[in-house]
Amino acid sequence: MSFCEGRVAPESIYGVLHRECFSLFSDEMFADLFTDVGRRSVPPMIVAVVMVLQRIEGLSDREAVERFAFDARWKYAAGGLDFDYPGFVHTVLVDMRARLARSDRPDRIFEVTLAAARAAGLVGRKRVLDSTPLYDAVATMDTVTLIRSAIRGLLQVADSALEAKLRARLRRDDDYASAGKPVCDYDDPVAREALVDGLAWDAYALLACLDERELGPAVDKAAELLATVVGQDLDRDAGDGVFRIARRVAKDRVISTVDPQTRHGHKTSARGFDGYKGHIAIDPDSEIITATEVTAGNAGDADPAADLLAADLPGDGAQDIGDRDVDEPGDSGNHPNPAAGGDTGDSDDKALGGADQDASDGQDRPAVYGDAAYGAGALLATLEAAHARIFTKVQPPTAPDGRFAKDRFDVDLAASTVTCPNAVTVPIRPAKGGGGTAVFGPACAKCPLATRCTSSTAGRTIAIGRYEAELTRARAAQDDPAWVTEYRATRPKVERKIGHLMRRRHGGRRARVRGRTKVAADFSLLAAAVNLARFGMLGLRRAGANWAAAPA
């Protein structure tokens, strides 16, 4: 399209796609998505270009096809199509996403951008990890709405014969046909209590009716959801037998029946959200996104780290990062961060970070950077096993009211003892899962430092985490000025990349779809679009059979 030549910047995403769309999105790349019978109405390369531009600009399907029809830059990006090239309906995008989701390579658009970056030498051995909230696309439900919606969902998926049997068990005067809250005087505590109790009895009656029946997948899934929402939010009074809303929050609580996988989450202790977490790994030198993952909002930042680093670390990375090292609760003043569980011990030849890691042989090893959320003991153990250079921050232990923190105690893992600031030594009592506890007990009663150490009449107890040694080495490494300099120069780069991903609210910060699998696919496509935009700034071009970036 000659009109765009000279008007569209070659370093823009439109310029990159115009030059490279045929190399990136060849017909062969999508051949497995289509049969040989019939005729495709829209070439898959054009659909892929529209999907990428849709994500980078935060558009709905209808807005995207409209933009393709009337924005010359979009047709220029799709290989220089004439302005009168016919458009297509938005369902073509829906169909392409469905085909990709059913395929063996649902994230192939992201994969091809990463492969091009690797071929151009833009992906080194460093990785920076971070996460960001992704707000869900559904409304958070209260307990009454959750239970009623789950009952309604079960009745909807049951066949006519089973539905008749289920409805015969219902006690409330409610046909469960409409969505939303049931009619009730919510200002009347007695009426509210009767409503909750009635919903509970209806729910348990339906579950009892299904007991020992052979259920189809849809009914089984709906029954499981109903059992979950009733069990998580209600308690039965032992005295009068009435079901009431529990005065607690269940672990891993379901917050919507429309999207049962979304969760309450906290990016920080003061900032909560409802939805998912998007996790990324980037190369800090080129700022290319190398991996993405999506988890429920209540998952820890370090939980998917092994998956983010799977292509970069030797071995299978099978260690469960979610099995983090956390001190036992008690008077020891544990930090809420999972990394705060470890403490003193002798550093060995596995020292992490520091100036020794800048040696020439160290540059051939992977390096992983992350904030304190990635200072979990299990992740540190995985990185040590992979001989990676570790630049993930570990929080120091804390204690309430300025008392002695755990780092004031001498933990000797080799001798399995702990010595307190008053030079009293006690053995570590091992725990089944690793680690253990050191109980000072009676020694604290006459200790002159007791008031500065504990307020418990039972004395001080020190919890020894399963990954005590790894956390000890990590804390020792981050005291090195060279480690601090490298960390401060490298880790913040991921924040800018998060900003690029979240630039648009629709499809960026706010999910466009429901369910973790679909949100993950959408997040991966967004990362591919951001990578393509980065290609323009790096001057990435196809050079014969290879890819090359412009000289720095």
Which residues fall in each region the model found?
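Anion-binding and metal-coordination hotspots
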Residues: 63, 81-82, 86, 91-552
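Conserved catalytic core of Hanks-type protein kinase domains
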Residues: 24, 67, 500
